[in-house]
Regions:
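A broad structural signal for short, well-ordered beta-strand segments within beta-sheet-rich domains
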Residues: 15-28, 82-84, 175-180, 229-232
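Juxtamembrane "anchor/assembly" segments of surface/extracellular structural proteins
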Residues: 1-59, 92-139
Length: 232
């Protein structure tokens, strides 16, 4: 059997911690069974800091866990934000100290239970209704952009679509099932989106870059027919 020696890369707020040693890593994401929608992904990791370098990690910093594939290209497998951070000194001497950085990160779905919406929806297909709910939270419009922010400040490779996208992934639209209209009734966004996804026989999930996505009822069969395999 071929020995699997994974090459990892941890990026926090866009900074790759290549001089640190990844000592422990746990990632949990998806759903527990087919009868419920996915919960927020969870990542717990420890980094050994043997370099005496100053650590600059804050709550809500972005976290990306990447794994090198057979072409030496790093592929993201988890994306989220820091919700807990601790530093533990494991050894100390006359020259310096060695630290363990303990980081807990949550995926994008953790944002939805904290956001409320009136949930007014017109009769439409499942994917379009879910997109309508999520885009108001995860896509900024011109009026929501700070006045001091100018297009010239963006990296040339960025477009408006990704520069102000704060977590919306692939949404299968329009979907396969037409859902009833919904009148104003205040609810948290997770409960609403989960109910819409269940009604459409689809599922919400976090992609490897930490974005919230929706797969409709035929997503896997269409993907299989197109690419010859499906992602679990």
């Amino acid at each position: 059997m071929t020995v699997f020696n994974p090459v990892w890369r941890v990026k926090i707020q866009g900074v790759a911690y290549t001089t640190y040693t990844l000592s422990n890593l746990t990632i949990t994401s998806g759903r527990n069974n087919i009868y419920q929608q996915a919960q927020a992904g969870y990542c717990n990791l420890e980094l050994l800091n043997l370099t005496q370098a100053i650590v600059n990690i804050n709550i809500n910093d972005s976290v990306s866990i990447e794994l090198q594939d057979s072409t030496a290209t790093y592929v993201p497998i988890f994306g989220g934000t820091v919700v807990d951070f601790g530093v533990e000194i494991i050894t100390a001497g006359s020259v310096g100290i060695n630290q363990v950085l303990k980081i807990t990160a949550l995926g994008a779905l953790s944002r939805l239970p904290k956001a409320l919406t009136d949930g007014v929806l017109s009769q439409d297909f499942d994917g379009d209704q879910i997109y309508h709910v999520l885009q108001d939270l995860l896509l900024n419009n011109w009026g929501e952009v700070p006045a001091a922010l100018q297009w010239a400040n963006y990296d040339p490779t960025e477009t408006w679509a990704n520069a102000q996208n704060v977590g919306l992934g692939e949404i299968d639209r329009p979907g396969n099932y037409e859902l009833a209209a919904r009148s104003s009734d205040r609810v948290d966004i997770y409960s609403l989106v989960a109910a819409l996804a269940t009604s459409g026989l689809g599922y919400i999930y976090e992609d490897s870059q930490g974005r919230i996505s929706y797969a409709d009822s035929t997503h896997r069969s269409v993907y299989l027919a197109t690419y010859g395999y499906t992602e679990l």
